A protein has these predicted regions:
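Structural signature of Gram-negative outer-membrane beta-barrels, strongest in the C-terminal barrel
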Residues: 231, 351, 370-374, 378-382, ...
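C-terminal beta-signal and adjacent terminal beta-strands/loops
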Residues: 624-632, 651-697
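Membrane-embedded beta-barrel scaffold of Gram-negative outer-membrane proteins
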Residues: 295-299, 303-309, 313-321, 478, ...
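Surface-exposed extracellular loop regions of Gram-negative outer-membrane beta-barrel proteins
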Residues: 109, 247-261, 383-386, 468-508, ...
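Outer-membrane beta-barrel translocator/receptor signature
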Residues: 132-135, 146-226, 230-236, 288, ...
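Acidic/polar loop-and-plug regions of large Gram-negative outer-membrane beta-barrel proteins
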Residues: 208-212, 225-231, 235-295, 315-351, ...
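Acidic, small-polar-rich N-terminal luminal/periplasmic segments of exported/outer-membrane proteins
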Residues: 34-168, 509
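Gram-negative outer-membrane beta-barrel transporters
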Residues: 546-633, 692-696
Length: 697
């Protein structure tokens, strides 16, 4: 498919208001517009922080909720883009990256969950989740092992799937067109399936054909997600199924530092440059998923909640990229500084994930104290069968790329890997006088990892959490919290000693202010310490020791406002100071954590205007700022500049029709996110224009 000219989407954007005005004029004599769904900006409750349906103002930990309407308004196309306006989240941590949704939270890596069950393990080979199938995304910042077991210190990103509703049959169908010849057909339909209202179904799906920023590569997807729900007098059961097939390639070409950020005048590569080999570079990923969610209330005191999921994912990832790592400052192999060597890489993981979480919930009182006690057991098993490609790359002139095919010898089977985790947890949410909430929790985990042909490794860990939040009046609720995490580290040192799990500890203090339902302001200060990080042994170059430590501290401010005159505002500001606090190499100690911005800020404003009885106009504008990043290594220290981007929305609703135009990176600013002393640069997003026409019924 030929790519659209960069100018053509902008011309379409300039022409769209005229087309929309014409549509409004034609609709003025038509039927009155249906009552429009309210744009929900200020979420009131979330389940990720406590695994119970708890008000945000009763949750003593920072959590952000991004609703489907909000991330659609902002023009998000993937999970990374959903989080661009969330406090403390570096959403595009590695720029435009089709391999996975890499983000950082408070300078550290989070773990990705879906519907409360873990979805990602390390560098996940699974296709990225389709956000058209989500109703919201919750971000819990900081360690969270008490409820979720082994996980990273950064926190949890929990994507919540669309589920069946028991009302009248409703839905939408739509088409999208946009930059890079994007063409997408999408639909969402659901409602009650019987007269009694005890059975409901929903179907969400889309088909997309598209190119992408990187030349040559496609970004095609098929997504199908049927679901069915049943509700009885005391029980509910929801079955969620999904199938996803992605045909794409690695958008990141690992462009050489010497030809991007540090390039000589006239020698900087365009961020769209493709340095791979057509027909070889590809990502082909299929994911099948089945989830069962069951709730049963025995009586007013005791209830059961159960969640089970099975995922089967198969991916082939192949890429030829520049070998900048052998000589980061000068990767060229010719006198004219044009030709570089390339590395041929291929991986073919076949993954099966089984997860189950079962909990009993007790709702009772002891004197003046109301308890919401949760006691649960969860289990997860991750299996991976892996093949790696045996191939040799070929040189290429990066300024006039004409590729020679790699030399491929075949696929080599790797040892199978299996990881299991069994955890038992208990949590008590104690409420006093309907004003003060105390949260106490503890957990014991047994984690086991096994690599075929090697001894298995077992880790046991106990983690704790505590939090206190109180309503002082006028909607002001200060809080304090402490939480822990652990993450098993597979392998052994040179002397046969198994590595210890990495440990994380966070102390947090903050204030939540909600004087009315349409306004929520959260301020949080935190300090995180992560220990047992692996570093090279200064006494033995062949050994690795766990003496590394990272300390992350910062301040966050986040607000959501929704006014009666169709005006909505969200804003976030964050300052993070993540640094290496302990290392075997004195050069690192006290230095900023690589590739981590210290400053983040964003704001989004949208306003609705009633044009007449049959039509409404909505305009939105957002600004995002990401501070500079540092990279320290053997090649010295480099700074990747900060960048500020703008996004825009123009939407017209005419009776049952909605026509929306989204533009992200409005000024088409070219930037990197980030560049590293290892020798490569990660390109940022270009301007992307997307037009969506949808019909609701």
């Amino acid at each position: 498919m030929p790519a659209l000219s960069p100018r053509r989407p902008l011309l379409y954007a300039l022409a769209l208001p005229t087309l929309l005005a014409s549509a409004v004029a034609q609709a003025q004599d038509g039927p009155a517009a249906r009552t429009l769904d309210k744009v929900t900006v200020v979420a009131e409750r979330a389940s990720t922080a406590t695994k119970t349906d708890t008000a945000l103002t009763e949750t003593p930990q920072a959590i952000s909720v991004v609703t489907q309407q909000l991330f659609t308004d902002r023009g998000a196309h993937n999970l990374q883009e959903v989080l661009r306006y969330s406090a403390g989240v570096t959403a595009d941590a590695w720029g435009l990256d089709t391999r996975n949704d890499a983000t950082s939270v408070r300078g550290l890596d989070p773990v990705q969950y879906q519907d409360g069950l873990r979805r990602s393990y390390g560098f996940s080979p699974l296709a990225r989740p389709e956000i058209y199938g989500l109703e919201r995304v919750e971000v819990l910042r900081g360690p969270s092992s008490v409820l979720y077991g082994a996980g990273a210190t950064g926190g949890i990103i929990n994507a919540m799937s669309k589920r069946p509703t028991f009302g009248a049959l409703t839905g939408e169908v739509g088409v999208q067109f946009g930059s890079f010849d994007r063409r997408q057909l999408q639909g969402d339909i659901g409602g009650a399936l019987n007269d009694a209202g005890t059975l409901a179904g929903r179907f969400v799906g889309l088909v997309r054909e598209s190119n992408m920023q990187t030349d040559v590569l496609n970004d095609d997807r098929i997504y199908l997600a049927p679901s069915i729900g049943w509700r009885g007098e005391r029980s509910t059961l929801t079955l969620l199924a999904s199938y996803q097939h992605d045909r794409t390639g690695s958008s990141q070409q690992f462009l050489p530092l010497a030809a991007t950020l540090l390039a000589l005048p006239g020698r900087r590569l365009d961020t769209s440059t493709f340095i791979g080999h057509p027909g070889f570079d590809r990502i082909d990923s299929r994911v099948y998923s089945l989830t069962a969610l069951f709730d049963h209330s025995f009586n007013d005191v005791l209830s059961l909640r159960s969640a089970v999921r099975y995922i089967d994912g198969r991916t082939t990832l192949q890429q030829m990229y520049v070998d900048s790592y052998s000589n980061p400052a000068d990767p060229f192999i010719d006198a004219d500084h044009r030709v570089v060597n390339r590395t041929a890489y291929g991986t073919r993981p076949d993954v099966q994930i089984f997860s189950a979480d079962n909990a009993l919930q007790f709702d009772f009182a002891t004197g003046a104290f109301q308890h919401l006690l949760l006691a649960g057991v969860d289990y997860s098993q991750y299996k991976e069968q892996l093949q790696r490609l045996d191939a040799t790359g070929t040189p290429i002139d990066i300024y006039a790329p004409v590729s020679a095919a790699p030399v491929v010898r075949g696929w080599d089977r790797q040892p199978d890997q299996t990881s299991t985790q069994l955890g038992v947890y208990v949590q008590d949410q104690i409420r006093w006088a309907d004003r003060v909430s105390l949260v106490l929790g503890a957990r014991r985990d047994h984690a086991r990892s096994k690599t075929e042909g090697q001894p298995s490794q077992t880790d046991n860990a106990t983690t704790y959490r505590a939090g206190l939040i109180g309503d002082l009046g006028a909607g002001v609720s200060p809080y304090l919290s402490y939480s822990e995490s652990f993450l098993p580290v597979t392998g052994q040192d040179l002397f046969g000693q198994a590595f210890k799990p990495m440990r994380g500890r966070q102390s947090e203090a903050g204030i939540k202010w909600q004087p009315a339902r349409n306004l929520l302001l959260t301020m949080a200060a935190y300090r995180i310490t992560e220990t047992n990080r692996q570093t090279n042994d200064p006494d033995n170059v062949l050994n690795v020791v766990q003496t590394g430590q990272i300390r992350s501290k910062g301040l966050e401010l986040e607000g959501q406002f929704q006014f009666a005159n169709n005006l909505t505002i969200t804003a976030a500001v964050a300052r993070n100071e993540a640094e290496v606090s302990r290392s075997n190499f004195a050069l690192e100690v006290g230095q900023r954590l690589n590739d981590t911005p210290q400053d983040l800020a964003s704001a989004w404003v949208s306003k609705g205007f009633q044009l007449d009885d049959a039509a409404r106009l909505r305009l939105g504008l957002g600004v995002r700022h990401v501070g500079n990043t540092a990279s320290l290594g053997n090649g010295g220290r480099i700074i990747t500049p900060s960048y500020t981007l703008a996004d825009a929305l123009v939407e017209v609703q005419v009776t049952d029709w909605t026509m929306a135009l989204n533009i992200t990176n409005l000024t088409d600013k070219r930037y990197y996110a980030p560049c590293r002393t290892f020798g490569d640069c990660f390109a940022g997003y270009p301007r992307v224009v997307t037009g969506t026409i949808s019909y609701r019924f």
